[in-house]
């Protein structure tokens, strides 16, 4: 999850490279924030570089050999090292009984359901900051409603919101319907000025 400082005409970029392969580069362009997904290969060593006007709010690896049991693997944006979750959560400032996200803002739980051997919890999330903002849906799973495993984010704000700091919106409240072919999500899409009014659309 990358954000770009709001500087007129300044593009931001992230580059991921590994020996023997062409580097992968993503430009934020006019976007102030963006969820970036890049494919990597097991056993390879990667180097990440970014422009000075880009900040990484959080990073994780997903789609491992057993993603539901293992969940995502969080990385330190500063050096790419693995984050040991036991030490990360074992602090006086962290709720120890209820689910809390890895970092930053969380509010309303949504789409609580049971599917394929797991309880699924979706929740509104701002992965970039410790304050309310354009909403994503985070995702976590559990077998006992006590021990939760973080999964990749499943919904993000509309792309037109990524470049406009004077609008708000994204994936607001909703629910889930379990059917034979999977989980179907229903939600409110919100788009409007910072203060709700006649131009707010849902």
Predicted segments, located by residue:
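Carbohydrate-active catalytic/glycan-binding domains of CAZyme proteins
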Residues: 1-202
């Amino acid at each position: 999850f990358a954000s770009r400082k709001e500087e007129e005409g300044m593009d931001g970029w992230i580059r991921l490279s590994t020996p023997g392969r062409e580097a992968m580069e993503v430009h934020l362009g006019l976007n102030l924030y963006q969820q970036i997904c890049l494919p990597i290969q097991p056993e390879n060593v990667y180097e990440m570089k970014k422009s000075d006007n880009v900040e990484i709010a959080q990073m994780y690896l997903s789609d491992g050999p057993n993603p539901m049991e293992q969940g995502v693997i969080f990385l330190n944006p500063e050096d790419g090292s693995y984050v040991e979750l036991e030490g990360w959560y074992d602090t006086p400032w962290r709720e120890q009984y209820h689910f809390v996200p890895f970092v930053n803002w969380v509010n309303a739980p949504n789409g609580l359901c049971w599917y394929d051997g797991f309880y699924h919890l979706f929740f509104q999330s701002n992965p970039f900051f410790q304050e309310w903002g354009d909403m994503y849906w985070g995702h976590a799973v559990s077998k006992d409603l006590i021990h939760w495993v973080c999964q990749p984010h499943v919904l993000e704000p509309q792309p037109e919101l990524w470049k406009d700091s004077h609008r708000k919106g994204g994936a607001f409240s909703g629910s889930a319907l379990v059917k034979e072919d999977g989980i179907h999500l229903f939600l409110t899409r919100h788009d409007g000025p910072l203060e709700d009014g006649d131009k707010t659309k849902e």
